Design a protein with these regions (language model features):
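Short, well-ordered beta-strand segments
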Residues: 7-9, 42, 81, 99, ...
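Short, Asp-centered acidic motifs that coordinate Mg2+ and/or phosphate
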Residues: 78-82, 168-169
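Small-molecule-sensing regulatory modules
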Residues: 2-51, 58, 66, 141-307
Length: 307
């Protein structure tokens, strides 16, 4: 790979470019060992960026944010794709490999509200902006007297809509707010047990072609092992459930010493039923744990989460 120039493909949002730059810095640390002369970032507009007024499930699902970038990777217009793992479908695209993950950012969910109120203090019938069924049902579990309304757009756009009184509060991921330096807006931070994050939340994934041996070896050096183990467990739950954008499922794993803890919840399609599991296993059985818990959830739910 002597004197090779590496092109990283990324969405063009402010947050996506922060993540891409973080990936670039990690790659540059190993560039000399692999004969890489230059690493540049290419901005790519995805369909998910273009369609801002509908749920992802209505316009193509999770792949809306990754598909366009993956096509450029397959066509060799870029060498590495940078994704927010939570936006990626559970099944790998043929010809590609996603096996490198940067150290996880804070996976928790946060509330930003008018007058800096906590969720418990919001007035009845307050309007909560959220982009996912999972968050909607999780909020309803805590406060069933609140109304959830779709909100799309980047973080700045969502905060602006809140300030324009279109919503009384919005739910976002801590990682995005923190990376953008907007922590001063946070009204409340939820623990991962109060609101279980989606699988892979807070994780940046690096993807390459599955036949690019030199880049595969480089990305092994960049990969964060404990993050890798945790998200494999979480993503296996999704794979077993064959989850899509309408699947309201939360999965969060954390490692404590030689043990991995996995907490999952699944809601029926209308959000009226909740199925919950928590279990631990030795770290070397993390992937198996995800599969087993996914199977148990599926059985408990009797497929009530599917259309």
């Amino acid at each position: 790979m002597k004197n090779r120039k590496i092109i990283i493909g990324s969405r063009g949002s402010k947050l996506a470019l922060i993540y891409a730059e973080k990936a670039r810095e990690k790659i540059l640390k190993h560039s000399k060992d692999f004969g890489i002369e230059e690493v540049i970032i290419k901005e790519i507009v995805t369909k998910g960026d273009q369609v801002q007024d509908k749920r992802l499930s209505e316009v193509g699902g999770k792949g809306l944010f990754s598909k366009t970038i993956e096509v450029e990777l397959l066509e060799k217009k870029i060498d590495i794709a940078v994704h927010a793992l939570k936006d990626m479908p559970s099944e790998e695209t043929k010809g590609l490999l996603t096996d490198c993950f940067l150290e996880r950012n804070d996976p928790r969910e946060i509330l930003i509200s008018k007058d800096n109120k906590h969720l418990k203090d919001l007035a009845s019938n307050s309007i909560i902006g959220t982009s996912s069924y999972r968050r909607e049902f999780q909020i309803k579990k805590i406060r069933d007297d609140l109304n959830c309304k779709l909100i799309r757009g980047n973080v700045d756009t969502r905060i602006r809509k809140l300030k324009e009184n279109l919503y009384d509060a919005i739910i976002l991921s801590y990682a995005g707010i923190d990376s953008l330096g907007l922590n001063q807006n946070i009204s409340q931070t939820f623990s991962t047990s109060e609101i279980i994050p989606c699988a892979g939340q807070g994780v940046i994934a690096l993807q390459c072609r599955d036949n690019d041996e030199s880049l595969i070896e480089l990305l092994k050096q960049v990969d964060h092992q404990s993050t890798h183990i945790s998200i494999k467990a979480e993503r296996n739950v999704l794979k077993v459930l064959e989850g899509d954008c309408e699947t309201a499922v939360g999965a969060f794993a954390n490692i404590e010493g030689s043990k991995i803890n996995l907490e999952v919840e699944l809601f029926s399609l209308d959000g009226s039923k909740r199925f919950y599991l928590k279990s631990s296993e030795s770290v070397d059985k993390a992937e198996k744990l995800g599969i087993e818990m996914g199977k148990t959830l599926k059985k408990m739910s009797n497929n009530s989460y599917k259309k």
